Amino acid sequence: MEPGIPPMIDKAPAYSHVLIAGGIGGATADFLMHSLDTVKTRQQAALYTNKYNGMVKCYSTILCEEGVFHGLYSGVCPMLIGSLPATALFFSSYEYTKRHLMSNYNLPETLCFLLAGFVGDLFASVVYVPSEVLKTRLQLQGRYNNPHFQSNYNYPSFRGAVKQIAKQEGMKTFFYGYRATILRDIPFSGFQLLFYEKLRQVAQKECGQKDIGVFRELITGSLAGAGAGFLTTPLDVAKTRLQTMIRTTDKVSDDINSGRYFFAKDENSKSKSAASLVKPKIGIRHVLGGLYKSEGLLGLFRGFGPRIFWTSSQSSLMFVFYEGIIRLFNKNNVLERD
């Protein structure tokens, strides 16, 4: 070990391995958990219907009415296209920032983990936010010409959605809810990595070795995801509402124009969604305030059950795959020093 370099940094994997393991691990976990993410999105955005109350009820309703691919796995294409490069960029940025802070600055280890998580997600957000907009809208829509749920979106395909949004709403639409997304994901990632690193250290002390095994990795990853998910649920609800709104300058109701309400009912719809006429230039602060006024504290935690289940499960799977791929590199004797 070189003098002055913390043991954690000296034994760290190569950045190229972090890039590969992060991309594969993140995308695989996101794919496996996508159906639950669809359930969470429907619950958060379906304002004026009780159709999707309850995680199990919502899951079974979508499955029975719309099927797997066009229902529970709607929006999976933009998710994968965004997830692979985004998680690869996230893990590599996180590792670089963490090592740089720990090697060059006299900062507490806890703060290094937290700040590195913030930076990693900030870099990754440039890639995943546009895909998140597409994914969220397609999840809310479900199948094309969906007779079971009216979301005010009806894209024939993933490519059709890209073309229609770009033509009718402009390219800036792909970054709708960007501020809300990074305000949700930057703290989420920071807390997730902080919790994971600290819990992993506890597990390493308990078992007396660096490799804590798959079971402990599942537990530490799950707890890290659950804790971070709980703290950021209101921001996740606001992000979903912002990305599924249809912006318009048309006059709607006096309540909406006065800023008292931010979601309008479409009386012709059999079931209503958040994709309704709204006041232009609505921000995350306005959405959170409107949610609290109209739905109370429970409105801020709408979709809490599936979100916590998703963040804990996705986090555990992601870290298991990530650590497993890193171990494969080590076992194959290809670990290199940067």
Curated annotation (Swiss-Prot):
Keyword hit for Membrane: yes
Record InterPro entries: Mitochondrial_sb/sol_carrier, Mt_carrier_dom_sf
Any GO BP annotation:
magnesium ion export from mitochondrion
* Subcellular location as annotated: Mitochondrion inner membrane
Residue spans making up a coiled coil are none
Q: Does the keyword Zinc apply?
A: no
> What Pfam families does the record tag this protein with?
Mito_carr (PF00153)
Q: Which UniProt keywords apply?
A: Membrane, Mitochondrion, Mitochondrion inner membrane, Repeat, Transmembrane, Transmembrane helix, Transport
User: What residue spans do the Solcar repeats cover?
Assistant: 13-100, 108-202, 216-328
List the record's Gene Ontology CC terms alphabetically: mitochondrial inner membrane
The way it spans or sits in the membrane comes to:
Multi-pass membrane protein
Q: What is its main location?
A: mitochondrion
Q: Which domain of life is it from?
A: Eukaryota
Q: List the disulfide bonds.
A: none
Name the family the entry cites. Belongs to the mitochondrial carrier (TC 2.A.29) family.
Functional summary from the UniProt entry: Mitochondrial solute carriers shuttle metabolites, nucleotides, and cofactors through the mitochondrial inner membrane.
The name this protein carries in UniProt is Uncharacterized mitochondrial carrier C1442.03
Source organism phylogeny: Eukaryota, Fungi, Dikarya, Ascomycota, Taphrinomycotina
